[in-house]
Curated annotation (Swiss-Prot):
Predominant subcellular localization, coarse grouping: membrane
Gene Ontology terms: cellular component: plasma membrane
Compartments, as annotated in UniProt: Cell inner membrane
Gene name in the database record: yciC
Name used for this protein in its record: UPF0259 membrane protein YciC
Organism: Escherichia coli (strain K12)
Membrane topology of the entry: Multi-pass membrane protein
Transmembrane segments: 20-40, 87-107, 118-140, 152-172, 187-209, 225-245
Protein origin, superkingdom: Bacteria
Length: 247
C-alpha cells in the first residue's frame, strides 16, 4: 500500500481534533509537573542572584569563558540550575510521550480514555521512556554542538523510537536501532514532520519571554503546555505512520 504524507497529516488532524481536550489536559499536567519539579530542584533566588556577582559578562568571549570566570560556588549553582531544568524537562517529556501514545492505543481499542487514565496506564513504561528520551536528547545535543546538522539528523532517525518502545514493547536500544533503520527507509515521510516540529519549537522558544508578562510560573506553564501540544501532534503523526508502515 502506498503511504502519502497528506493522508497521514489528515488522520493526525482528525485524531487531534477528536481528542483535543484529553490531549490538552495531558499537556497541561505534564507542563505543571515540569515547572513544579524545576522549581523544587532549582537553586533559590538568592543563590541565582550570586551568578551575576563579579562575573565580567561583557568581557567573556563565550559560554566556556564565562563559566571559567565564575567561582567554584557559582559553577556549582549553575550546574544545579542546569541539572534541575534538564531533569524536570525529561520527566515531563517522558510522561507526555507515554500519556499520548496510551491515549492513541486506548482510543484505537475502542475504550473510553481520560488524561489521568492515560498517564496512569503509561506508568510501567515511564522508566524506559525516560532513559530513551535522555539518550536521544544527549545524542541530538552533541550533534547540534558539533555542526548542527548531525543533531537534526539524529532527531529524525530516532523519532520513531518512543512509538516502537511502547507499541512493540521493545527495549531502549532495540527501539533506537529499529527506529534508525525504519526511518532511513521512510525518510521522505518522517523528515518533514520532525523538521516542522523543530521549527515550531524554535519559534515558540523565541516568543517564550512574552509569556512571562503574566507571572514567571504561569508563563512557564503556558509555554510548556504549547510545547507539549506541538510534541503531541508529532507523536500522533509518528504513531499513525508507524502503524501504516507495519501493514
Amino acid at each position: 500500500m502506498s503511504i502519502t504524507a497528506q493522508s497521514v497529516y489528515r488522520d493526525t488532524g482528525n485524531f487531534f481534533r477528536n481528542q483535543f481536550m484529553t490531549i490538552l489536559l495531558v499537556s497541561l499536567l505534564c507542563a505543571f509537573i515540569t515547572v513544579v519539579l524545576g522549581h523544587v530542584f532549582s537553586p533559590s533566588d538568592a543563590q541565582l542572584a550570586q551568578l551575576n556577582d563579579g562575573v565580567p559578562v561583557s568581557g567573556s568571549s563565550g559560554l566556556f569563558d564565562l563559566v571559567q570566570n565564575m567561582s567554584p560556588e557559582q559553577q556549582q549553582i549553575l550546574l544545579q540550575a542546569s541539572a534541575a531544568s534538564t531533569f524536570s524537562g525529561l520527566i515531563g517529556n517522558a510522561i507526555l510521550a507515554g500519556g499520548v501514545i496510551l491515549i492513541i492505543q486506548l482510543v484505537s481499542a475502542g475504550q473510553r480514555v481520560s488524561a489521568l487514565r492515560a498517564i496512569g496506564a503509561s506508568a510501567p513504561i515511564l522508566p524506559k521512556l525516560f532513559i530513551l528520551i535522555f539518550l536521544t536528547t544527549l545524542l541530538v545535543q552533541i550533534g547540534i554542538m558539533l555542526v548542527v546538522v548531525p543533531g537534526i539528523i539524529m532527531a529524525i532517525l530516532l523519532a520513531l523510537a518512543p512509538v516502537m518502545l511502547v507499541q512493540d514493547k521493545m527495549g531502549v536500544f532495540a527501539s533506537m536501532r529499529s527506529s534508525m533503520r525504519l526511518t532511513w527507509a521512510n525518510m521522505r515521510l518522517v523528515a518533514p514532520a520532525v523538521l516542522s516540529w523543530l521549527l515550531a519549537k524554535t519559534l515558540l522558544l523565541l516568543f517564550a519571554s512574552s509569556f512571562a508578562a503574566l507571572t514567571p510560573e504561569i508563563g512557564a506553564v503556558l509555554a510548556n503546555t504549547l510545547s507539549n501540544l506541538i510534541s503531541a501532534i508529532l507523536l500522533i503523526y509518528l504513531f499513525r505512520l508507524y502503524m501504516l508502515i507495519r501493514q
